[in-house]
């Protein structure tokens, strides 16, 4: 493979310790492969051998931008924290889906049920995504930790770059012209409530809070000249520093020149006419009427205000691409010489492969029944072959690489089996599944007395919740973790486990790849003999690996028989354990538990930014308790009850009753009833999926049938 020679990226690696164990050899082999032009390599690294540190050393040595692809938000957040520590002076960013909840638009022909798109957007993750692209177009020392959402459409990088506003101290420009430029970047003017993505004007001073930054800009004018440019704290207005030169990037990823919208409307009208003719020739009059009404409404919205609900379905005409063309994604923002690391590739690669087929199947149904124009099919994730073309030089990283990775690398792997700490793979014990809960409870109590932690994997979410509740009733501090918790809640829960706020965590499929929990000395796998996806050889090896960071580690498989998957997982664990013991004996190494500080995670960073946003908003006019304000809370209460969030509805009710006694007073003078969402620890968490949050779309839900 020919390598595009570009200027080296100035990475500054913070090395808390030198590479050891198998790391030096693995680092050298990977660097040699990249520099010799190898298209693909595989790093077979056992759990706890420092694969992340190996990746960081490779990035620092080859001095090229890097993408770290992860299969879930929890692991991506952990990797982000680690790379931030390794590269404190470089641009390390976090790019995952910004949806806390997402119900895609769909139609079920068998029942004639149309489901409108419904979503809840996490504003903090949106900020982090925008920070990612702003760094990619402005510098080369960039490491992006991303999830599979990186293969979805993101807007044109060329349009993004063309709309960047370049400001210089002493530059001649009219104030109104500058304000129009900010509007073109999709920033909104709000002189009262200052928040992310907004700007305000105070005399000859313009203050703008970029959608991708934690600080704001103040641009001071003297007539038609930019006299001073400052970075300021949004909360207090205090100047951080002054600069002579400033780039302001678009507020959103989907931006385009105004003439592009008019051209797209013309193309959409032509496509609508063609599709209506097809429906009418087939006798599909209902579908034709449905498509005509919906599309004409959307086109009117586009013409008048520049956007419409579901505008992403018109992304191909708006981008000016040909039908069937590959959409622009995060990969198109990278320079040509970037390198890709696919972490836990045995899980991540199948995710990438599956995305396109599932998306297309759903959208074909919408097009065939008149809910969308055919151009909606081009609003899609990358096909697998398109993804392969865009990843450049790639390194698959896994303790259990699959056949695909081995085929790409011709069966060659770079092994990393020896841990720098001398830790061994854990001993595996098989215990009868009969009476497994009673036996496990006793084991958890033993670990709790030693200030150690326990991970338990169950087969279903319901079982995980019930087991956590039962353990709590028995006096054991226990929580559950599964997909109904959002990305920040999951990370927060794992940090609380490490900090000792509870002793046992029960999960389903999230307690596997990559989780770095040195305090865990016992991993218990319930119903290990139930052959299937959650109890396959790969799944068992990955789950066993969660106990590989503690010198007292042990794994218990609860089973009444030994399946083929169990036997292969036990054999592989024992093979690695023998290699590790021989290495330790040869070099006189005594295994010792890893001691890691509990780092400030991305959830803490997001929470701090959210608090600064709130303070900046509160610094404007004081909020007074009015009848309208109380009425709004009552509407929230009713909506929460409809979504089955009864605990939140009860808290809102108490708050409404409290505030009715203080009409006319400033809100800041009244002690507010706590309104945090329930469900993080032991509760059922039902009803969370439909919860509307700030940034949620206004999609209509299917009404629930009334009980007779």
Curated annotation (Swiss-Prot):
Q: Which residues form the Helicase ATP-binding domain?
A: 32-419
Annotated GO biological process? nucleotide-excision repair, DNA damage recognition; SOS response
Organism expressing this protein natively: Rhodopirellula baltica (strain DSM 10527 / NCIMB 13988 / SH1)
Q: Name one GO cellular component term.
A: cytoplasm
Where located? Cytoplasm
Please report which protein family the annotation says this sequence is part of.
Belongs to the UvrB family.
Q: Which domain of life is it from?
A: Bacteria
The name on file for this protein is: UvrABC system protein B
Regions of biased composition (Basic residues) lie at 683-708
């Amino acid at each position: 493979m020919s390598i595009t020679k570009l200027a080296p990226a100035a990475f500054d690696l913070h090395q808390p310790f030198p590479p050891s164990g198998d790391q030096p050899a693995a680092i050298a082999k990977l660097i040699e492969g990249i520099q010799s032009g190898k298209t693909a390599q595989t790093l077979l690294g056992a759990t706890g051998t420092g694969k992340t540190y190996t990746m960081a050393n490779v990035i620092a040595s080859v001095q090229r931008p890097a993408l770290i692809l992860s299969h879930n938000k929890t692991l991506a957040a952990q990797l982000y924290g680690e790379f931030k520590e390794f590269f404190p002076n470089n641009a390390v960013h976090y790019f995952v889906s910004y949806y806390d909840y997402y119900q895609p638009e769909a139609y079920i022909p068998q029942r004639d049920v149309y489901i409108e798109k419904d979503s809840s957007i996490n504003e903090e993750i949106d900020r982090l995504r925008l920070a990612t692209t702003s760094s990619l177009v402005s510098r080369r020392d960039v490491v992006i930790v991303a999830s599979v959402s990186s293969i979805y459409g993101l807007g044109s990088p060329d349009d993004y770059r063309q709309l960047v506003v370049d400001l210089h101290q002493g530059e001649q420009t009219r104030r109104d012209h500058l304000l129009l430029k900010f509007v073109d970047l999709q920033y909104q003017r709000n002189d009262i409530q200052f928040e992310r993505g907004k700007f305000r004007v105070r005399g000859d001073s313009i203050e703008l809070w970029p959608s991708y930054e934690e600080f704001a800009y103040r641009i001071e004018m003297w007539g038609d000249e930019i006299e001073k440019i400052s970075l300021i704290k949004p909360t207090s207005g205090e100047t951080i520093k002054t600069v002579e030169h400033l780039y302001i990037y678009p507020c959103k990823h989907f931006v385009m020149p105004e003439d592009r919208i008019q051209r797209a409307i013309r193309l959409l009208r032509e496509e609508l006419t063609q599709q209506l003719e097809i429906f009418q020739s087939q006798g599909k009059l209902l579908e034709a009427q449905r498509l005509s009404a919906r599309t004409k409404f959307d086109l009117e919205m586009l013409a008048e205000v520049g956007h419409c609900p579901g505008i992403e379905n018109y992304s191909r005409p708006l981008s000016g691409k040909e039908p069937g063309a590959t959409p622009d994604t995060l990969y198109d923002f990278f320079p040509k010489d970037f390198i890709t690391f696919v972490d836990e590739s045995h899980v991540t690669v199948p995710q990438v492969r599956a995305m396109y087929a599932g998306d297309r199947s759903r959208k074909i149904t919408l097009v065939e029944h008149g809910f969308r124009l055919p151009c909606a099919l081009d609003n899609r994730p990358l096909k697998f072959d398109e993804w392969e073309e865009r990843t450049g030089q790639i390194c698959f990283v896994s303790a259990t690489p699959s056949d695909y990775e081995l085929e790409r690398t011709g069966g060659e792997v770079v092994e990393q089996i020896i841990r720098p700490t001398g830790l061994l793979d854990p001993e595996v014990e098989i215990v009868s599944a009969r009476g497994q809960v009673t036996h496990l409870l006793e084991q958890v109590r033993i670990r709790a007395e030693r200030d150690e932690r326990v991970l338990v994997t169950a087969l279903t979410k319901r079982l995980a919740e019930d087991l956590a509740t039962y353990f709590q009733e028995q006096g054991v501090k226990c929580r559950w973790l599964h997909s109904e918790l959002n990305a920040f809640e999951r990370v927060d829960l794992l940090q609380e486990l490490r900090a000792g706020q509870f002793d046992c965590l029960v999960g389903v499929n999230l307690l596997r790849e990559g989780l770095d929990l040195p305090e865990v000395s016992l991993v218990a796998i319930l119903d290990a003999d139930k052959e299937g996806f959650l109890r396959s050889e790969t799944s068992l090896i990955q789950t066993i690996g969660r106990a590989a960071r503690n010198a007292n580690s042990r794994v218990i498989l609860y089973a009444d028989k030994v399946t083929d998957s169990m036997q292969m997982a036990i054999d592989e664990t024992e093979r690695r354990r023998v290699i590790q013991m021989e290495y330790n004996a040869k070099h006189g190494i005594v295994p010792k538990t890893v001691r890691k500080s509990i780092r400030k995670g991305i959830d803490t960073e997001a929470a701090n930014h959210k608090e600064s946003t709130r303070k900046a908003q509160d610094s404007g006019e004081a909020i007074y308790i009015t009848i309208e304000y109380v009425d709004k809370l009552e509407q929230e209460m009713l909506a929460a009850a409809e979504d089955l969030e009864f605990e939140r509805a009860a808290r809102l009710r108490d708050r409404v009753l409290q505030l009715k006694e203080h009409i006319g007073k400033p809100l800041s003078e009244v002690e507010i009833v706590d309104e945090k969402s329930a469900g993080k620890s032991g509760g059922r968490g039902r009803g969370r999926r439909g919860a509307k949050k700030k940034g949620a779309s206004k999609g209509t839900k299917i009404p629930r049938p009334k009980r007779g």
